[in-house]
Regions:
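C-terminal secondary-structure termini that scaffold catalytic or DNA-interacting sites
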Residues: 69-70, 84-99, 106-108, 128-129, ...
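Basic, Lys/Arg- and aromatic-enriched nucleic-acid-binding interface segment
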Residues: 2-60, 70, 97-98
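DNA/chromatin major-groove-contacting recognition/catalytic segments
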Residues: 30-34, 85-90, 206, 227, ...
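Residue-level detector of conserved, well-ordered beta-strand and adjacent loop positions
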Residues: 10, 24, 32, 77, ...
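Short, basic (Lys/Arg/His-rich) helix/loop patches that form interaction surfaces
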Residues: 29, 33-38, 50, 102, ...
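Arg/Lys-rich amphipathic alpha helix in sigma70-family domain 2
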Residues: 1-2, 114
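Short functional hotspots where side chains directly engage DNA or cofactors
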Residues: 7-8, 71-76, 125, 191, ...
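Conserved tyrosine-mediated DNA breakage-rejoining catalytic core shared by Y-recombinases
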Residues: 8-13, 26-27, 60-115
């Protein structure tokens, strides 16, 4: 052999990567209805309709949001990171491919225009003092979504000096006991990355070619885009019928 076919292979085991489905159109509608008027709304809209990574959205400044251009777009030029719970904004992006200009749909244009009119900060998503969010501030913002989920919760209470574990399973449409204004309206998991994954998936469903999706998503490796593309393209048996039928078009011997 002129090369070692096992080179680079690790003997270490590991858990398989968990494949996450994107949000359905109905779930997106429910999510947006749930967070409308709440702190995570703008971040959610940017994730769903521009596909920005969390570090890109939290670093986004108004000088990179072009709402009045013939084709409105967002320029990704900065990245956020947290150091000792302090936000650090840098022009060093995750990869070279992360630097990109993303056309944005009308719904996001309108959302950003409204946010800009009310903003006193150079940052699109900012705290009460106009500064970028710290890690703990972002977690508190995202908690508005978490507390409205029907996901099972566990907590501990001290009873007679002992720590007792309790499990609570909220029911869809129910109200939080301590805060009746909070309605359990989300019976599906939502993460910041899932917003971006939904954006990418919807582009592929709409027939946008994978190379263009790779650019819009800021994927340096085309494999990342193509893995999603394969799942989107071949996720339903009825969509595979013609492919399989063509591959085995020969008549079966009687």
């Amino acid at each position: 052999l002129e090369y070692n076919p096992c080179e680079g292979i690790s003997a270490k085991g590991g858990k398989p990567t968990q494949k996450k489905d994107s949000l359905t159109d109905q779930q997106v509608e429910v999510l947006l209805e749930t967070v409308k008027g709440l702190p995570p709304y703008l971040f959610t809209m940017i994730g769903l309709y521009a596909g920005l990574r969390r570090e890109e959205a939290l670093a986004l400044q108004w000088d990179c949001v072009f709402l009045d251009a013939p084709t409105p777009y967002i320029s990704v030029r900065r990245a956020w990171r947290s150091e000792h719970n302090r936000p650090v904004i840098s022009t060093t992006l995750k990869t070279k491919a992360a630097r990109r200009d993303i056309p944005i749909p009308k719904c996001l244009v309108n959302c950003l225009r409204e946010a800009k009119a009310a903003s006193k900060s150079e940052y699109v998503i900012a705290d009460s003092e106009g500064q970028p969010l710290s890690y703990s501030q972002f977690k508190r913002v995202w908690q508005y979504i978490v507390v409205r989920s029907t996901k099972e919760r566990t907590y501990y209470k001290y009873v007679n000096g002992q720590s007792i574990k309790y499990t609570v399973q909220p029911s869809l449409g129910g109200h939080q006991k301590n805060n009746p204004n909070i309605v359990y309206s989300l019976d599906f998991d939502v993460t910041p990355h899932l917003l971006r994954h939904t954006y990418i998936t919807n582009l592929l469903y709409a027939g946008v070619d994978p190379k263009t999706v790779q650019y819009l998503a800021g994927h340096e490796n085309s494999k990342t885009t193509m893995d999603i593309y394969a799942r989107v393209k071949y996720n339903k048996p009825e969509q595979l019928f013609d492919v399989v039928n063509s591959a085995f078009h020969q008549a079966v011997p009687s």
